[in-house]
Structure formats: C-alpha cells, structure tokens
C-alpha cells in the first residue's frame, strides 16, 4: 500500500504507462478493478501493516539498473514513498551486468524490473517454484496450485481463477506490480499515416508508413 503507482506512471514514465496493482492489464477481461483498488496507495494502511514487523537493522536494499533513467526515476520515487511511510530503505544503482549478477546471487531485498508477459498473463516464470525469473526464490504450494488452476481454466472459469490468483498475490506480495508500459510514436499531427502497431512493436509495418509533406 506504500507505492503511488499513478504518480510513477504519469511522472517517471511520462504517461507512457498504465498503473495497476495487478499483474493483468486493465484492458483485459480478466482484470478485477476492486482487487486492484484493495492494494491502492495508502501510506496509513502500510504503516499499520508494518507494525511489529522486523525489517532488519540495516534497512532494505532496493536494486535498479542504472542504465535506464526512467526506471531510476521510478525507483527513487518508490524509495521516497516508502521512506515517507517509515520504511528504512536505500536505493542501489547498478550497471546491467552487476544488476543481473546481483539478482542471480539473490543479493537484494527488493529490485525494480521490467517483464514482458505472455498474452495469457501466465506468471509461472515469475512466481512459480523454480521459475526462470523467480529471483527471490518464492516457493509456495498455494501459489503453484493457483497458477495451475489459472492455466487450466476454461473460458467460463478463467476470470474467477484470475481473481483467486491475484488476491493471493496481493496478500503475500512475492511481486508488486507497478504498471504496464505503453509504446508510442511521436509525430506532428496529420503527418504520418499507415501505422499498424502490434504487441511489443510499435514500428510493425514500417515499410507501409506514409509521411505527408
């Protein structure tokens, strides 16, 4: 509850992102707004939730790749927000090579990362036991069961399976979604036509673009 996702999407990513507390895009029919709202920014609730928690005398170490200025800005904003709620946390900016090495060693408390999800929003690689992107080593039978149920759910049960999985992830927080990035092409009004962007490639069909004088 200590992260203001809207300010990160609007300021750190210059409106090129959609804030959400769920690992599912808000435009998806699987998205549950009430669940996302339940994890929305609320510093007071974070303070209450941290009462009696032991976070270590040295505070938390938060890693970010120093080679991406937008991510550094977002990470700093997160640090400022958590610090404002009383969390002792420091930001460590690392080169991509050092950042990846630290993740592989598990030498971190928190880290900011970008992940390209598959179209079905399968999170097995992120939070499944022995998942290839599960750098935190999260291993939980309930999570694995919910992931399996989500993958196996037919059309009628898929929404409820997604809700159960997202509710579990909010309660346990092995990952904390921030936003989904948007791709964009900036051009003068009316100068460019024929754009045909697809997922992960705003320049799809570049050879068919028409630039008007």
Indicate where each model-derived feature is located.
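Ligand/substrate-recognition segments at binding pockets and active sites
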Residues: 51-117
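Short, solvent-exposed loop/beta-turn-alpha elements that line the ligand-binding surface or hinge
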Residues: 29-46, 102-106, 124-151, 180-213
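Extended ligand-binding regions for polar small-molecule ligands
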Residues: 1-10, 141-159
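Bilobed periplasmic-binding protein-like "clamshell/Venus-flytrap" ligand-binding domains
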Residues: 10, 52-66, 111-114, 153-189
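Solvent-exposed loop/turn segments at secondary-structure junctions
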Residues: 5-8, 15-19, 28-31, 67-70, ...
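Structural transition elements
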Residues: 2, 14-52, 68-73
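Periplasmic-binding protein-like
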Residues: 1-28, 166-174, 179
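Small-molecule-sensing regulatory modules
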Residues: 59, 72-77, 84, 124, ...
């Amino acid at each position: 509850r200590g992260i203001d996702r809207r300010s990160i999407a609007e300021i750190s990513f210059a409106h090129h992102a959609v804030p959400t507390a769920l690992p599912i895009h808000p435009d998806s029919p699987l998205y549950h707004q009430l669940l996302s709202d339940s994890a929305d920014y609320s510093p007071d609730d974070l303070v209450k939730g941290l009462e009696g928690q032991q976070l270590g005398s040295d505070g938390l170490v938060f890693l970010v790749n120093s080679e991406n200025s937008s991510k550094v800005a977002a990470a700093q904003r997160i640090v400022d927000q958590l610090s404002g709620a009383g969390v002792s946390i420091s930001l460590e900016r690392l080169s991509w090579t050092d950042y990846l090495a630290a993740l592989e060693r598990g030498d971190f408390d928190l880290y900011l990362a970008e992940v390209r999800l598959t179209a079905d929003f399968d999170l097995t690689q992120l939070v499944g036991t022995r998942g290839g992107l599960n750098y935190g080593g999260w291993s939980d039978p309930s999570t694995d069961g919910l992931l399996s149920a989500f993958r196996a759910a037919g059309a009628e049960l898929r929404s409820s399976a997604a809700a159960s999985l997202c509710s579990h992830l909010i309660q346990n927080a092995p990952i904390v979604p921030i936003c989904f990035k948007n791709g964009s092409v900036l051009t003068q009004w009316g100068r460019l036509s024929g754009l045909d962007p697809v997922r992960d490639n705003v320049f799809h069909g570049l050879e068919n673009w028409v630039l008007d004088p």
